């Protein structure tokens, strides 16, 4: 992933670097939508709808897993196109959400290879998630303390990521339309609306002042599934930080999916690297939205006396929009959330 609070902190920090443009204005107006967008596909890991539908006989893979294992360019292209088809306040909400989603990809694809290395990940081996989640929770504590001077326990997700009914409808409907196209997930709009509203509530349950909630969950998991699954995600008020997870000693690590890619970068190095990647993505996203707006405006001003001239201008505008979209998709890079490698070059996890 990296963890929920690391993504939240990344969003807070990178916002300061963004230029004052159309995208940043939308984020400013809909900050909680942006914060939720920063959680990317992870919101679906906290959504009970998929397990319930499977129990009812509808064989559906978890959308969060599906998105993490699929090429990303088609999703981001459709998200940007659908966002530009919206108008007014709806479009502002969608821009803020997509901007956050871009941040999730930037950090995941940049930092995940290091995390997989130090958690000794092996494809197909059960029990990896417990180690992975514990490692990322340790990073959550370190990053929140470094940048926000507070514990993840003190970050109230219901306040920071809770959307209004209107915002959740816009985001839910947007996801419903795009996921139907990209992942053949033809579910109800209400399911997506519930998923985005449910996430801040569910994650607030993973905060424990005394640690009692975590211990109870551990007992249940041991009894039911034989190992810890979600309990490592519970954050406590008092927690002994393990700063070694940041690799500030710069130990060597390699990409599990392409072992010749070796690095000694720390998590903080990767955090800063992801910022630069993200800012380029947002600049390209902003340019496409501007080109689209100008194109619509010019089209409404045409009349029969300037039809030929208008047609030529329309072609030029289309070329500019295509270039802007290409630039945006280059920034996205079709990079895997897990390996950071491009699906355009070879099949990856």
Q: Model-predicted segments: where are they?
A:
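N-terminal leader/auxiliary helical segments
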Residues: 1-100, 105-349
């Amino acid at each position: 992933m990296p963890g929920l609070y690391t993504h939240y902190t990344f969003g807070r920090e990178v916002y300061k670097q963004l230029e004052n443009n159309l995208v940043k204005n939308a984020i400013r107006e809909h900050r909680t939508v942006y914060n939720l967008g920063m959680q990317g596909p992870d919101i679906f890991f906290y959504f009970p709808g998929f397990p319930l539908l499977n129990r009812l006989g509808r064989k559906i893979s978890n959308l969060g897993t599906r998105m993490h294992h699929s090429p990303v360019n088609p999703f981001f292209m459709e998200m940007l196109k659908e966002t530009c088809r919206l108008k007014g306040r709806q479009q502002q909400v969608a821009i803020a959400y997509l901007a956050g989603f871009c941040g999730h990809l930037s950090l995941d694809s940049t930092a995940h290879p290091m995390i997989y290395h130090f958690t000794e990940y092996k494809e197909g081996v059960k029990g990896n998630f417990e180690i992975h989640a514990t490692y990322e929770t340790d990073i959550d504590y370190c990053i929140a303390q470094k940048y926000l001077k507070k514990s993840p326990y003190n970050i109230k997700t219901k306040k920071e990521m809770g959307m209004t009914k209107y915002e959740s409808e816009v985001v839910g409907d947007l996801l419903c339309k795009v996921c139907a196209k990209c992942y053949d997930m033809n579910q109800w709009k209400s399911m997506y609306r519930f998923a985005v509203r449910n996430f801040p509530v569910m994650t607030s349950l993973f905060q424990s002042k005394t640690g009692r909630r975590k211990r109870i969950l551990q007992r249940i998991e041991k009894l039911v599934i034989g190992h810890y699954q979600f309990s490592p995600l519970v954050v406590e008020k008092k927690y002994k930080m393990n700063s070694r997870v940041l690799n500030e000693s710069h130990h060597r690590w390699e990409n599990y999916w392409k072992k010749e890619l070796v690095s000694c970068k720390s998590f903080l190095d990767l955090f800063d690297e992801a910022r630069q990647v993200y800012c380029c993505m947002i600049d390209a996203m902003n340019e496409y939205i501007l080109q689209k707006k100008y194109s619509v405006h010019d089209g409404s001003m045409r009349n029969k006396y300037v039809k030929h001239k208008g047609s030529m201008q329309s072609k030029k505008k289309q070329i500019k929009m295509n270039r802007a979209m290409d630039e945006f998709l280059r920034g996205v890079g079709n990079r895997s959330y897990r390996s950071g490698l491009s699906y355009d070059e070879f099949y990856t996890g």
